[in-house]
Regions:
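Conserved AMP-binding/adenylation subdomain of ANL enzymes
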Residues: 229-248, 253-314, 322, 347
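Conserved AMP-binding A3 loop
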Residues: 40-44, 198, 206-232
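Conserved ATP-binding/catalytic segment of the ANL
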Residues: 377-380, 384-386, 390-445, 462
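Structural core segment of the AMP-binding/adenylate-forming
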Residues: 58-59, 89-180
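Gly/Ser/Thr-rich phosphate-binding loop
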Residues: 170-175, 249, 292-296, 304-369, ...
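Conserved AMP-binding/adenylate-forming core of the ANL superfamily
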Residues: 29-82, 99-104, 176, 225
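Conserved C-terminal "lid"/linker of ANL adenylate-forming enzymes
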Residues: 172, 468-470, 515-571
Length: 571
């Protein structure tokens, strides 16, 4: 499609209102309803609620102040976010998986003055952290059915302290009442909303995300409206051949992450109808909704590939058979999965970026892709490699510095203003970027050899039997590894080989050893894995071993499984 009309930088709420006259009666969102039905939300209804909520927010926030949102995906999540931005504020998403302590840290550190929250479990975490949230003026409940007294009672039953209920009542307001406040202001002054949006500068922050660092507390990353708008325009330019105005999107990625928020904003720009789903329902919704747009993480693409057993007709049944614009993000995707979908006529686009870059730096694209790379730099992005191979970035989508952390900001930029990504990379002869490792994850063996563990671990990415490998061996004579298996494929292999129950453990170890031997044959002797341990505990976000963006927390793995890994040197 011709994306030219959408390339001019603008604040995100403008995407809804600039095209509202022609879209008002059309459907923006489809929400799951009981008995498998869907409930529609029109562009007009969506826009009206943004307008009302923005005028409520204007009464609670001064220009440039921050509002946090702590909720799973729902239309009100996006309504609140765009309302805050339209009012000149900064939206601060909080991951739904955050504990009460983590939630308190982000809200307190961000200086949030307004908090949007949904679901009883999340509101209970807010109440549990109440003593740390003194700077929050108002808590807005996204669902009117959420009962503060019941949440307080639930904490009492668990023996946790609860703030006085009178204080809760004073600071908490339900969604409908907040909308009513905004509607009253709108009736008093019909020009107030437009004045507020017109006053927002592209160069002021509109979004602040917290990095899910593999160690240490998260850092606040303020992004200006221009940062995000320029990155969005690059996405449009690169993917134009796959884009359609008014497409059907199946939206399930958390909007608290930049990937999911970006998908929702792209839908606002291009007039998509987005069916809202969640991790438990998305595989069932795919063949029902039959989307042309679908963005996901590697684990789900891999589930689809395994379920199809390589049969293209079966794959079409599982996905609805109309996929056109598809992205995979958060971690690397196995090559065999990319090749399977490509045979089915679907290019799974991968790229590379980080929160500090709004977020994308490189993308594979319809007219230029390599499955062994993360693509070429975006049109507005400059990349170069430092002497040690670290990827350095510069451009209008790169942020200006961390919130309240000048020391970290200084450490993140070179003296001549390039952002240090912390990743080691290389360019192919035809200009595609390949990621080799995280700079800080370099291991130095007892023999003085510098080893990039990811360069070894990534060689297992396409292995059907192995989910993850984490290499260990800093200051040691040789390398060992923790191995997480793919239960379904290993089980199928054992059944196919008719392995007796008593021999299963030995057969599994032999299988893993063969896979490791195959990779070792491609490595220098000092890079080879000499011993391994199979870990049964799940490597997931919920287990605390992956960040919300699916990066391995090496320090946490060392804490939990270090004894088992160290024992391999004594075996």
């Amino acid at each position: 499609m011709d994306v030219t009309p959408f390339l001019e930088p603008r604040i995100a709420p403008r995407a809804v209102f600039d095209s509202l006259a022609e879209r008002r009666s059309r459907v923006r969102f489809m929400l799951p309803a009981p008995r498998g039905d869907w409930h529609s939300v029109t562009w007009g209804s969506f826009a009206d609620d943004i307008r009302r909520m923005a005028l409520f927010v204007s009464s609670e926030l001064s220009g440039g102040e921050r509002a946090a949102v702590f909720a799973p995906n729902r239309v009100e999540w996006m309504t609140a976010a765009l309302a805050v931005q339209a009012a000149g504020g900064v939206i601060v998403p909080v991951y739904g998986s955050s504990t009460a302590e983590q939630t308190a840290y982000v809200i307190e550190h961000s200086d949030a003055r307004l908090l949007f929250v949904d679901t009883a479990p999340l509101f209970e975490r807010v109440l549990a952290a109440w003593e740390h949230l003194g700077q929050v003026r108002r808590v807005v409940l996204l669902d009117d059915s959420l009962d503060p007294s019941r949440a307080a009672a639930a904490l009492n039953e668990r023996g946790l302290s609860v703030p006085p209920f009178a204080e809760i009542e004073r600071r908490v307001i339900p969604w409908s009442r907040a909308l009513a406040v905004g509607a009253a202001r709108d009736r008093e002054d019909r020009a107030a909303f437009e004045r507020a949006m017109n006053a927002v500068s592209l160069d002021q922050p509109g979004l602040m995300l917290y990095t899910s660092g593999t160690s240490g507390p998260p850092k606040g990353v303020p992004l200006t409206h221009r940062n995000v708008a320029v990155n969005g325009a690059d996405w449009l330019r690169c993917n134009a051949p796959l884009l359609d105005e008014g497409a059907v999107d199946l939206l399930w990625l958390p909007m608290s992450h930049v990937f999911g928020f970006g998908e929702a904003c792209l839908g606002n720009t291009l007039g998509w109808t987005s069916y809202m789903s969640d991790p438990l329902a998305v595989l069932g919704h795919l063949p029902q909704v039959r989307p042309s747009v679908f963005m996901s993480v590697p684990s789900l693409w891999e589930k689809l590939a395994v379920s199809s057993k390589g049969d293209l007709e079966r794959l079409a049944e599982l996905t609805g058979g109309r996929l056109r614009f598809c992205l995979s993000g958060g971690a690397g995707l196995k090559r065999e999965v990319k090749e399977l979908f490509h045979r089915a006529g679907v290019l799974l686009i991968e790229g590379y970026g980080l929160t500090e870059c709004s977020p994308t730096l490189t993308l594979n694209r319809p007219d230029a892709f390599r499955f062994d790379s993360v693509g070429k730099p975006l049109p507005s992005v400059d990349l170069r490699l430092a002497q040690d191979g670290e990827i350095l970035a510069r451009g209008p989508s790169v942020f200006g510095g961390y919130h309240k952390d000048p020391a970290a900001t200084r450490d993140t930029f070179t003296e001549d203003g390039w952002l240090k990504t912390g990743d080691i990379g290389r360019f192919t002869d035809d200009g595609f970027l390949q990621i080799i490792d995280r700079k800080k994850d370099i291991l130095v063996t007892a023999g003085g050899k510098n080893i990039a563990p990811a360069n070894i671990e990534l060689r297992f990415r396409d292995d059907p039997f192995i989910e993850h490998v984490v290499v260990h061996g800093d200051a040691r004579r040789y390398l060992v590894a923790a191995v997480w298996l793919s239960p379904a494929t290993v089980e199928a292999h054992l059944r196919e080989q008719q392995v007796a129950p008593a021999a299963r453990d030995e057969a599994v170890r032999a299988l893993v050893q063969r896979r490791i031997d195959r990779v070792n044959a491609e490595l220098a002797s000092y890079e080879t894995i000499k011993r391994f341990v199979i870990i049964d505990e799940p490597l997931t976000v919920e287990s605390g071993l992956l960040t919300p963006t699916l990066k391995v927390k090496r320090r946490k793995i060392g804490e939990l499984f270090g004894d088992r890994l160290e024992a391999l040197y004594d075996a």
